[in-house]
Amino acid sequence: MISLPEKFLEDVKVILQDEYEEFIDSYNENKTTGLRLNTMKMSKEKFQKLNLFDLEQIPWTNEGFYYDESVCKPGKNPLHEAGVYYLQEPSAMSVVPKLDIQKGDRVLDMCAAPGGKSTYILSQLDDTGLLVSNEINPIRINALGENLERFGARNCIITNTDSTRLRKTFTGYFDKIVIDAPCSGEGMFRKDPVAIQDWTYSKVLECQSIQKEIIRDGYKMLKKGGILVYSTCTFSREENEDVIEEFIAENEGAVLIEKERLWPHKIKGEGHFVAKIQKLDDEDCRVKEMKLKKLNNEIKEYRSFEKKFLNINLDNRFMLRGDNLYLVPDECPNVEKLKVLRYGLHLGVLKKNRFEPSHALSHYLKPEQIKYVQNIELNDETIFDYLRGNVINTGESRGWVAVAVEGIPIGWGKESNGVLKNHYPKGLRIKY
């Protein structure tokens, strides 16, 4: 069995008492792995009919499945690159369902990287409402951006700031907030030996201090009647019950709806803590909608691209940042005082006398919204050639073409003289 920190074992024994030995025995078992379906791109029925992997339903989420990584590698399947599913630890999938997201909700993911909760929220919103996906760590935010881009949504703003600045911008604004708080990571011990090496009790207390600050700021951003879900992937009482109980005691309008621990000896998962809080007190909201400059001549090259290569006309909610053109969410809040990575959907880059579509746009559009689609079957080696950055011989000269796998757009190519030049981003190209 793996060697676990002595102080950690002492504390868990106090919490679990008679179940302690059963908990320890769970470390002799393999880690659990899961994937979660993006229902904006493929229905559960169609996904299951493909019969790609030996999947088992995860009981606490309709879109989640267990898989055995010794038998299959979903991360090396083109459907993963297409954003059809997201690889996520199974017990972590228990968090977002507690939010009870409704279409049109305004939602905040305060500690979002690498994107597990945010991608789940986007699929629940189904291209309605708004998600503000925040990550304070500037290194981790790049992975967040890539994962959200792959899921294909226009209603998401990605910010890179701390909870205090968020609170000052969004007081009383959100219907739902999730805080997957930075923690000591005790629930990662079985799958990541580095987490064991990094663990100290002082880290537990350091995380607790940060968690208390984040939940206070998060609560201020909820509107009356709103729901806040707090979660960690750790087992310490200090970072879980103690944080929640102190917060509830300090806030008369905060009501604890439920709290739950998922232990690895009780469920098939690595472990999680989840608490659901409702806000009953009023909060004065002064968030203003972003004022957009009407763009006409500035986007003529985009409109020309749209006319030639798309079957839709996107509404005129455009924003220019340098040469980058964005389609911003409806009723987009003013976020000018925050560091913003993405203002909604990045459409592409306006260059001299032409428009170059973004990778994000290919993931957002449905195949019927694109004039020219080169569909490739999942079992055709050509799709791997495309993902590696190779050209594809098509025999046509249609200009901008969306490459799709099983009817799901996965990226762009530009076709001339019978050859499709590859525009799949170099940083995303596969090595296998």
Name these PLM-found stretches.
Residues 172-174, 209, 227-230, 234-327, ...:
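Class I S-adenosyl-L-methionine
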Residues 114-127:
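Conserved SAM-binding loop of SAM-dependent methyltransferases across substrates and taxa
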Residues 1-15, 19-50, 280-432:
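Polybasic, low-complexity RNA-engagement segments
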Residues 104-113:
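Conserved class I S-adenosyl-L-methionine
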Residues 134-172:
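S-adenosyl-L-methionine
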Residues 139, 176-217, 229, 233-240:
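Mobile active-site "lid"/loop adjacent to the S-adenosyl-L-methionine
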Residues 125-126, 222-224:
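Helix-to-beta-strand junctions that scaffold the AdoMet/dcAdoMet cofactor pocket
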Residues 102-105, 167-178:
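A short acidic, Gly/Pro-enriched loop at the edge of an enzyme's catalytic core
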